[in-house]
């Protein structure tokens, strides 16, 4: 498996997390990943958005340190870095997840 570069948890900033979560599509992605509690492909997370739009959202989520993406063949497997984020910023992500209303 090939892995995409992600920031170390020490480099993750709360302002970057909050910026990443300021978009409704990214909030939905994070909510779905949290609800699933497992790795999900981009196809499983289909939000009826163009592929380029989804790539953009995942790039921002990865840069903020919220999502980890592993490439396995042709699939991009995405997972939420919930435990790491909760350890660095206790309660922040849990509080945000409670506000997400999934369709």
Question: Over which residues does each language-model region extend?
Answer:
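Conserved acidic functional residues
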Residues: 23, 57, 90
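N-terminal helix-turn-helix DNA-binding core of bacterial DNA-binding proteins
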Residues: 16-50, 72-84
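Generic macromolecular interface patches on structured domains
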Residues: 39-40, 55, 95
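Canonical helix-turn-helix DNA-binding module
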Residues: 43-67
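Conserved segment of winged-helix/HTH DNA-binding domains
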Residues: 13-14, 35, 77-103
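N-terminal leader segment of winged-helix/HTH proteins
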Residues: 1-21, 66, 86, 97
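N-proximal short alpha-helices
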Residues: 2-3, 18, 27, 31-34, ...
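Intrinsically disordered, low-complexity regions enriched for glutamine and histidine
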Residues: 1, 54-55, 74
């Amino acid at each position: 498996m090939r892995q995409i570069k992600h920031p170390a948890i020490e480099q993750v900033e709360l302002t970057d997390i909050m910026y990443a979560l300021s978009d409704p599509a990214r909030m939905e992605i994070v909510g779905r990943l949290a609800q699933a509690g497992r790795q999900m492909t981009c196809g499983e997370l289909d939000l009826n958005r163009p592929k380029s739009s989804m790539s953009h959202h995942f790039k921002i989520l990865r840069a903020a340190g919220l999502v980890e993406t592993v490439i396995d063949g042709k699939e991009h497997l995405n997972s939420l870095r919930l435990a790491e984020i909760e350890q660095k910023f206790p309660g922040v992500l849990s509080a945000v997840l409670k506000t997400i209303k999934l369709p």
